[in-house]
Amino acid sequence: MYSTGLVRWLVLAVVAVLPLVSALGLVPYPDQDPFYYPPSGWQNKKPGDILRSRKIQAASVGALKFNLNAWQLLYRSNSNTAHTPSYTITTVLVPHNANKKRLVTVSSPENSNWIRCAPSYAFRYSGVLELTNFEPRWEQMLYMLYLEEGWVVNAPDHEGPNSANAAGISGGHMVLDSMRATLNSKEIGMDKDAKLIGHGYSGGSIPNGWAAGLQSSYAPELNIVGWSLGGTASDPMMTLDFLDGSATAALSLIGAVGLVDGYHDELYDLFNNQIWTDEGKRAVWTAHHACVYEMVFLFMNQVIQSPKYIKGGKNFSDYPQVAKITNKLTMGTNPKYVPRKPVFMFHAAYDEEIVWYQANNTAVAWCEQGANIRFLTETNKALNHVVTYLLNLPYIMEYMRDRFAGKSYYNGGCQFDSMSEYPLFDTSVLGDRFKEILQITLDLLGKEIGPNDSIYRAKLANHQNPNKVGIIHPSGMKSTTITPGEGGNDSPASKIVRKTGKASSGNSSTESTSKNQTQSGGDTTNIDQYSADGKGAGQGNN
């Protein structure tokens, strides 16, 4: 019996490899578009400085025009250190009647090693239905929720010019510098004191999580009011191991290739001369010439860490140079990089792609280092990786509205909850906001995008502030705030699960199990359902 997650990958992978339609040359690919290449002297600019700017017709799946204003900015940034010049592009969507004091930056789960899979290219209108490179395209449809609020949306190509997937620190720099660039754009005209929120799910959680940790030292001037992270892939080695041999084994290969692309000087010779077999090198070439769904189709259930692809069938963690970098890129291990603004994290206990342990470990580590976090575990067994994202959209929206409104977030402490409900269809949570979700359909069919719609007018007629929550009620979500350092079953330390073996990548030495308690009702749910050890664990929910 296939899980809905696997069906999603199967269907979209088949669609991706069918030559149904193409852009017919109407929009040049990024590697053939001069806009993607910086002018001479760009290295001397400051991070966030705009190098090129253009107005575009934004669209979904190539053919469904967005009825709003959109710009693309080529801007100066940095790669994996704060002093290593790089550059990338961001796409900025400005709805009608926009509130220029609100900016939501979304890190798309690109999950690819090819520049032609970049979100910026997926935003372009070609006039032809395009079903390839669907990974960033499907999430773009969700941006309507933010745009209907009147918020400006900023979507950077966080993998940069080398398409360095999962490179962590590099992506964090590019996310923060995309905010700077958006604020610097005179054409867009953002308020210089605009409130900023960063959001990222799955592959997008990596650059977004690193942006959260880097912000206080790298971009302290930005008026960040919150970060939203879901399905957080916070431990690179655990992710590589967990996915290997599963239906989405391609993501393990893509992640390894991304590490090499992001840390070329440190890892390229090692991988090219000592790690990859000839078949492995062919797989790397394929990764550099395909988007994620094609890759999933081609490498389904393949064991990457095997003699077929790696000399001697070794594991990535067997190489100290690799383990050193993945340890460095594990969120929560360095006290220098801790979020200093409120963070909302949510994760499915039965996530078949990104194991729950790593996200929980990071939340606990950050909490113990003074972060302000709410970590929500979804315990319903029907909630897989993608469904968890979709069904938590009301909570994401509620969180963002509250942050923009300046509300306190658990008194600056930490909160660890679990729940089993389907939040999207819980009327006590969603209420009339279901009507607003229906607006997405109209938006994609060409309706003028922005808060000047029937719901907006109805709120005004009822003397409601359309920019306040007022409708969503977080029933079943309230529980006692947990402060780092408290003892007993309610302390963050009791919630952590550290696994030994290959998947731990040497980041943890203590093996334990944990029960995540729903504090509002007192019930307990055993989260220790997956073993993070061994290859092929990602198939556990299929």
Curated annotation (Swiss-Prot):
Induction: Constitutively expressed regardless of pH conditions or exposure time. Its EC number is 3.1.1.-, 3.1.1.3. Residues 502-516 have a biased composition (Low complexity). One of its GO terms (cellular component) is extracellular region. Disulfide bonds join 117-291. The active site is at 202 (nucleophile), 351, 385. Glycans are attached at residues 315, 360, 452, 507, 516. Its main location: secreted. The keyword Lipid metabolism applies. It catalyses: a triacylglycerol + H2O = a diacylglycerol + a fatty acid + H(+); a monoacylglycerol + H2O = glycerol + a fatty acid + H(+); a diacylglycerol + H2O = a monoacylglycerol + a fatty acid + H(+). Keywords: Disulfide bond, Glycoprotein, Hydrolase, Lipid degradation, Lipid metabolism, Secreted, Signal, Virulence. It is an enzyme of class 3 (hydrolase). Residues 466-542 are annotated as: Disordered. It comes from the Eukaryota. Residues 1-25 form the signal peptide. One of its GO terms (molecular function) is triacylglycerol lipase activity. InterPro entries: AB_hydrolase_fold, Lipase_secreted. GO terms for biological process: lipid catabolic process. Residues 517-529 have a biased composition (Polar residues). Pfam families: LIP. It is found in: Secreted. Belongs to the AB hydrolase superfamily. Lipase family. Class Lip subfamily. Secreted lipase that hydrolyzes acylglycerol lipids such as triacylglycerols and consequently releases free fatty acid. Can hydrolyze 4-nitrophenyl palmitate tro release 4-nitrophenol and palmitoic acid. Due to an absence of fatty acid synthase genes in Malassezia species, secretory lipases are essential for the yeast to generate free fatty acids from degradation of sebum and assimilate them as lipid sources for growth. Plays important roles not only in lipid metabolism but also in the immune response of host cells and pathogenesis. This is Secreted triacylglycerol lipase LIP3. The lineage of its organism: Eukaryota, Fungi, Dikarya, Basidiomycota, Ustilaginomycotina. The gene is LIP3.
